[in-house]
Amino acid sequence: MRLFGLILAGGEGRRMGGTDKASLTLGGRLLVTWVAERLGPQVEELAISANGDPARFAGLGLPVLRDEHPQGPLSGVLAGLRWAAAAGADALVTAPVDTPFVPGDLAPRLWLAGEGACAVAEAGGRVHPACGLWPVAVAEDLAAWLAAGEARVMGFAARHGAARAGFPDENAFLNLNAPEDLARAESLLRKDA
């Protein structure tokens, strides 16, 4: 089993005032660094899906993949699947840049839940489809899905009968969409310190 990883960092950050979330800091460190340090050890190769100037990620030493046709997170997933397939990977594990507490066992738990097929994370009764495992075999179906104007991650996951991998810590998938979410994450860091 060859698992590759992808940090989804292509969003516009509208609820953060148009700020590039990858450039936001938590505990004095970039969000993209948090996710890279948590997801990287779980996968054979790691890349970032982002549009705009790739030089802003130069310090991480990771490949930056651009969306062919920006249509939200699934466009990034498609770019990642094509990159992973070209390198001989079996599947791609994704995590958004704004989930800095992503679990250190995300990839293996997703793999086990889906038995190598599509799987998404679930915690506290909520599904987190952007934290998912996508076999490279679904790439062309995803391309067709996007070409048909579909863009919902959960819709594509459901189309492939994605299994759900349960995680006990709700905060593991805390999504930093707004300034108050970032403040909550800072508070959690202080509690854990």
UniProtKB/Swiss-Prot annotation:
Its cofactor is Mg(2+). The N-terminal domain determines nucleotide recognition and specific binding, while the C-terminal domain determines the specific binding to the target protein. GTP binds at L8, A9, G10, K21, D67, D98. This is Molybdenum cofactor guanylyltransferase. The lineage of its organism: Bacteria, Pseudomonadati, Pseudomonadota, Alphaproteobacteria, Rhodobacterales. GO terms for biological process: bis(molybdopterin guanine dinucleotide)molybdenum biosynthetic process. Keywords: Cytoplasm, GTP-binding, Magnesium, Metal-binding, Molybdenum cofactor biosynthesis, Nucleotide-binding, Transferase. NCBIfam families: molyb_mobA. Monomer. Pfam families: NTP_transf_3 (PF12804). Its EC number is 2.7.7.77.
